[in-house]
Swiss-Prot record:
It comes from Desulfosudis oleivorans (strain DSM 6200 / JCM 39069 / Hxd3) (Desulfococcus oleovorans). The gene is mraY. GO terms for cellular component: plasma membrane. The keyword Plastid does not apply. The lineage of its organism: Bacteria, Pseudomonadati, Thermodesulfobacteriota, Desulfobacteria, Desulfobacterales. It is found in: Cell inner membrane. It catalyses: UDP-N-acetyl-alpha-D-muramoyl-L-alanyl-gamma-D-glutamyl-meso-2,6-diaminopimeloyl-D-alanyl-D-alanine + di-trans,octa-cis-undecaprenyl phosphate = di-trans,octa-cis-undecaprenyl diphospho-N-acetyl-alpha-D-muramoyl-L-alanyl-D-glutamyl-meso-2,6-diaminopimeloyl-D-alanyl-D-alanine + UMP. This is Phospho-N-acetylmuramoyl-pentapeptide-transferase. It is a multi-pass membrane protein.
Amino acid sequence: MLYHLLYPLHTHISFFNVFQYITFRTIYASLTAFLICFLLGPFTIRTLARMQIGQYIRELGPQSHQGKAGTPTMGGLLIVFSVLVACLLWADLTNRYIWVTLAALAGFTTIGFIDDYLMQIKKRNKGLSARAKFLAQTVLAAGICLLIFAASDTNTVLLVPFFKRVAPDLGLFYIVLGVFVIVGTSNAVNLTDGLDGLVTGPLVISFVAYMVFAYVAGNAIISNYLQVIHVPGSGEVTVFCGAMAGGLMGFLWFNAYPAQIFMGDVGSLSLGGALGTVAIITKQEILLTLVGGLFVVETLSVIFQVGFFKATKGRRIFRMAPLHHHFELKGWAEPKIIVRFWIIAIALALIAVSTLKIR
């Protein structure tokens, strides 16, 4: 909105020329989202507590988590609100990718909201059935992919990190890949959200990494130099990623250990879905497994645990899955697990960004 209102004035007042720069608008989108979460955080916590919207703890989870019962949840709505406002203020609203990312965010927010709402009604840690949730996510992800590929300049080539000459064209199968990436990321982030601030930090790191990828993909000169796929218009997604990172940092102020508020499924499902959507738009789908390596490992720990348990009729690989619960039961303090996982996320993101130059 500010871009459309103020940038046209640059012919009269040269200062407003700064609104043409994506970097400038990304910085202020990030600050806007951060301030919204930071300033509205206490009000949100009080409101959720007054409405008795508290976290229900999984009965089979670690006993140490029982003390978290009743902590205000569904705080992800605050993050989504901050991102929406920041994008409406600072993004180019004529850019189709901004609306695709916001649509993905809104769609997965709706699924997460219904899931959390049902938990509050049932008064237990059980919302939508796994089948209903997966079906809703798949339909939504397919719609998002169709929106992305509706553009005439859409590229269905898959960029393979480290190999500049390996770029298979998947054709229509790319939509299947896109659905898998979006739904998989949404659920992986949801599984990782099990400790205070555990998923918030890596999400900040992931969106900062994709700020770089979006800017590079949207710039014809830089993308050609680095030999990555140029996606016209995708540079504006940098503003969206900046808003995401800022909103998450503002939320982390209250979500850090000991958490005063949880994001709930309305947060984890929506933010994961948005991250997967950004990966598709920027043509960095494979790198998401590295940037979000922590989410991948947490998800695989659950898959291996369940598979091994069924195959061996009761034996386990880990003391408990997802992986962070395994370390809890080994006696690691919660803050230590969180910080160490953050360190791993930072290292993985740095390696991922470095692949832009390693080809």
